[in-house]
Every structure is written in C-alpha cells, then in structure tokens.
C-alpha cells in the first residue's frame, strides 16, 4: 500500500544545491585531494572520548558540509533521532520501535512501548547475563557429569553470529584463557564438524541464538548438538537459548532461555543477550563497559550539534559520495588484526539495513541507496586490491581504522602511507606507468585502544551512521523484506521437491 507523503527528498532545495556543488567538484582537477584544503577555521577532525574522526581527505568544503546539514534538517533528522531513542514506532513496515539503544541505557530510565515500561525487562535480562556468566567463570556451572564448563559454542547466523564473533576476536586481551570459544553458523557440515572434534560434550555449553527460533541453519545445527547427549536431562546443563519466542525453545527441550524482543533487530542485537558468550569471555563488568561505550555514542548522536556529531557527519559525507559524486561502494580497512571480523559485521549491518530500493511510502526510489560494503585487514590489501585502488577504473570511498596504541608500530605508518598515496596520488615523468591519480575520498578513524568501551562505541557509531543515511534516503533500515521473500521462495521450492 502506497502511503501519502511529502515531496521526494530529491526535490528539496538543499538537494538541488548539492547537485550544483557536485558538478563544480567534478569539473575540478582530479589532481587535488579535496575541493578546498583545510584552513585554520575549518575543522575536519572531531572526537568523542575514545574515537577521533578525521575527514580531511574527503572532497568536501565548508559550503558542502553546511548544505548537507541543511539537508539533514529539511528531512527532520533531529526529530527522527529522538524518535529512535525514545521508542517511537519508526519501523513502519512492522509497526514497532527499533530500541537497540535501550539495551545499553545504563540510566535505566523508563521507556514505554504501548504503555509498558520495557526497561524492567532489560535490567532483569542483564542480571541474568551477570548471574550466568559469573557462574560459568567461577566454575559453578557444571555439565551432566559434574565437571565444570571448559568450552562455549555459539550457534547462530547473521547478527546472532557476527557480533559475538567480532567481540571475542577484538577483545582477545580481555578474554579469559580458561575457556575455549567456538562459533557454528553455516549448514555446511564442515562448520559443525570442525568444532565438534575440538570439544568434550561433557564440559561444553551451547548458546543457541535465534530471534524467531525458526532460523533453519541455527535449528539444524542445534539438533546436531542435541544428538551428542543421550537424554533430555543432559541437555539442561548444556544448552541456553536466546530468543523472542521462549516457548519454541522449550518445545525442543531447552529450559534456560534469555529473551530478546521484537523491537530489537537481529543485526542490531550486539548489546543484547545474543552476546552472552562475550559476557562469559570477558566478565560481566567488562561487558557493561561495552554497553557504556555504545550508550555514550547514543547520547552523542542525540545531543551534539551536527557540525560536531561524528555519526551524522559520517553519514552525510557518505551521502555526498554516494548520491552526488556517484561512488557507490564503501571500502573499510582495519589496521589491526583484532578488528579482522569488524568488516563483515558492518557489511551485514549496512547492506541488510540500507540495501533497499523501496521507500517508506512503498514507492521505488529514484536515487542510489546503501553502498556495497567491502574490505578487510588493511595491510593485506597491499597484496590484493591495492593495485585497483591506485590505478583501477572503479572509484572507491574508504574508511581507514587504526589504533593509537599502534602508533609506534609499522602497521600505522603503512596506513598513513597508503592514505597519502590514494588521496594525493603520484605523478612521475620518468615512469608514466607509475602514475596514480589519487583523489580517493576517505575517512580516518583513530581508536584510542581496542577495549570493550571503545569497541562498543565503534559499533554504535556505525549503527547511527546507517540510521541517519536511511532517514536521508527515506527508507526503513529495520526490516528485510527481500530476505523474507527469498525464505518463502526457498520453502516453496523445498516443499515442491518433497512432493
């Protein structure tokens, strides 16, 4: 059903003025790293606690930033951010809020949905996470044979896998070495078998995470894990479910269930009980630090003016690159082995949220929306796609992420060298084959460290950036109708093949 709406965002005055600016930029010499070099009164470096955001290598100037902020105000972005955090039903297609921010609101202030305060459930679930993680870490959670847990296996896919996986790897300095941590996400038999050969079922805890508890891949692997135990009584000590449908978990024999709610999207469940494995690994106190980092960014995005608002600036400059400079991909390079899994995490978060061609009014959009997100470990790019970045015919935009704690190491100097080459280019008369045009727009995110607090802040930064872009594009980032349609088609094909 098509809803009535105001005029298209492309008809707004700020949009048309940005188009004129973009035309001027495209006519500008490609040898320039940006339209107007930074002056003393043009600040392109912003900071929130543990993260510095530097956009000095973007092709923007003061005029463009001002117009982008005008665009944000024209689409009522301040109101939309307030609606997100205050629990308004902004997930229009499913008629529900998107309240992942409530999961890390440590003030525990009342948030009402249909007259009910959800924070009591959030706080209660946090307490369950604390109790379970403490029991396991204190060796008081025993398997069926009376031995304490030594291995924790996370069974889930998508948001139920990528978020916990990012944490366990990124926070390796905080992770208890008294336990082994494993992940099973794929229906490929090797995914399950590669883990099972490493564990002893007597001392293993399986966490089965599925919001719907109908996810085919997750339930298939859970049933395989059940088969490791002889009777239902044994399952009690070895399985915990995280789901919005506890009755479905109970039906298959899992008694211990932690809730997630329909107002939390799977890909936004980073701060929920879906991340129980992380609380076990780093301890509940450090898990709260993860929540605190994310919550501080929530506060920052809601109350900081747009000229100093890092998620908003990242989003608006992304809009500029995508919709006005027509660069439809985002390369994310992390210069830390600890952040190896951050790129696939953001890839899902961004492309599943904003990979839409139908707006909130049910109409096809007439402009580009979410970019293709790709990337990986930055230094390894030197030996894979760095050649394309230097001299290829495809234009790219980049987010370069470094740790300040690595400033004395070669890894960060490698990053700075690559940013310089890709933005400023290389011109040499002696070797025409070595010409590099440069002018690649890029952000530089400098993390103070790779602590739980900083990781929480980084994840929230990208969550809010993606939400802000969805507002500009007038799309719903909290549903996934394409995926649901594909699932339905798969069920029909499977049913037909069984007839």
From Swiss-Prot:
GO terms classed as biological process: gluconeogenesis; glucose 6-phosphate metabolic process; glycolytic process
Principal cellular location given in the protein's record: cytoplasm
Pathway recorded for this protein: Carbohydrate biosynthesis; gluconeogenesis; Carbohydrate degradation; glycolysis; D-glyceraldehyde 3-phosphate and glycerone phosphate from D-glucose: step 2/4
EC number: 5.3.1.9
TM region(s), chain numbering: none
Gene Ontology molecular functions: carbohydrate derivative binding; glucose-6-phosphate isomerase activity; monosaccharide binding
SUPFAM superfamilies: SIS domain
Active-site annotation: 352 (proton donor), 383, 487
Keywords in alphabetical order: Cytoplasm, Gluconeogenesis, Glycolysis, Isomerase
Catalytic activity, as annotated: alpha-D-glucose 6-phosphate = beta-D-fructose 6-phosphate
PANTHER family: GLUCOSE-6-PHOSPHATE ISOMERASE (PTHR11469:SF1)
Function as written in the Swiss-Prot or TrEMBL entry: Catalyzes the reversible isomerization of glucose-6-phosphate to fructose-6-phosphate.
Full protein name: Glucose-6-phosphate isomerase
Organism: Legionella pneumophila (strain Lens)
Lineage: Bacteria, Pseudomonadati, Pseudomonadota, Gammaproteobacteria, Legionellales
Gene behind this protein: pgi
């Amino acid at each position: 059903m098509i809803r009535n709406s105001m005029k298209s965002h492309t008809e707004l005055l700020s949009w048309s003025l940005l188009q004129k600016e973009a035309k001027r930029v495209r006519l500008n010499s490609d040898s320039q790293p940006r339209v107007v070099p930074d002056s003393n009164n043009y600040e392109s470096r912003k900071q929130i606690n543990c993260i510095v955001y530097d956009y000095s290598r973007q092709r923007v100037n003061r005029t463009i930033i001002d117009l982008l902020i005008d665009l944000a105000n024209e689409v009522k972005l301040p109101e939309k951010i307030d609606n997100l955090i205050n629990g308004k039903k902004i997930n229009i297609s499913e008629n529900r809020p998107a309240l992942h921010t409530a999961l890390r609101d440590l003030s525990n202030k009342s948030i009402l949905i249909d007259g009910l305060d959800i924070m009591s459930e959030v706080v209660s679930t946090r307490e369950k996470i604390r109790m379970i993680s403490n029991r396991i870490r204190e060796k008081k959670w025993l398997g069926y044979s009376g031995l304490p847990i030594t291995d924790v296996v996370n069974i889930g896919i998508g948001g139920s896998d990528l978020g916990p996986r990012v944490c366990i790897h990124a926070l390796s300095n905080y992770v208890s070495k008294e336990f082994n941590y494993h992940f099973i996400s794929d229906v490929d038999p090797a995914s399950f078998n590669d883990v099972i050969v490493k564990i002893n079922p007597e001392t293993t805890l399986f966490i089965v995470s599925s919001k719907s508890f109908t996810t085919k891949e997750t339930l298939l692997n859970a049933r395989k894990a059940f088969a490791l135990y002889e009777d239902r009584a044994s399952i009690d000590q070895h399985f915990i479910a995280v789901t919005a449908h506890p009755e479905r978990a109970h039906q298959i024999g899992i008694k211990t269930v932690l809730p997630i709610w329909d107002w939390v999207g799977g890909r936004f469940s980073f701060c929920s009980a879906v991340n129980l494995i992380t609380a076990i690994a780093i301890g509940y106190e450090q898990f709260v630090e993860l929540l605190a980092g994310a919550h501080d960014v929530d506060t920052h995005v809601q109350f900081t003016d747009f000229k100093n608002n890092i998620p908003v600036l990242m989003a608006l400059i992304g809009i500029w690159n995508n919709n006005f400079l027509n660069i439809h991909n985002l390369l994310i390079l992390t210069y830390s082995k600890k952040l190896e899994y951050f790129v696939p995490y953001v890839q899902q978060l961004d492309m599943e949220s904003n990979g839409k061609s139908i707006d909130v009014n049910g109409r096809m959009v007439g402009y580009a929306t979410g970019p293709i997100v790709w990337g990986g470990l930055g230094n390894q790019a030197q030996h894979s796609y760095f050649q394309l970045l230097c001299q290829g015919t495809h234009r790219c935009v980049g987010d370069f992420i470094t740790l300040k704690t690595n400033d004395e190491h070669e890894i960060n100097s490698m990053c700075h060298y690559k940013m310089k080459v890709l933005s400023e280019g290389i011109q040499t008369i002696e070797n025409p084959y070595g010409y590099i045009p440069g002018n690649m727009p890029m952000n530089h995110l400098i993390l103070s460290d790779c602590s739980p607090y900083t990781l929480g802040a980084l994840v929230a930064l990208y969550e809010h950036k993606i939400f802000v872009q969805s507002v500009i594009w007038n799309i719903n980032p909290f549903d996934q109708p394409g995926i649901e349609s594909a699932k339905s088609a798969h069920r029909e094909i499977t049913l037909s093949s069984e007839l």
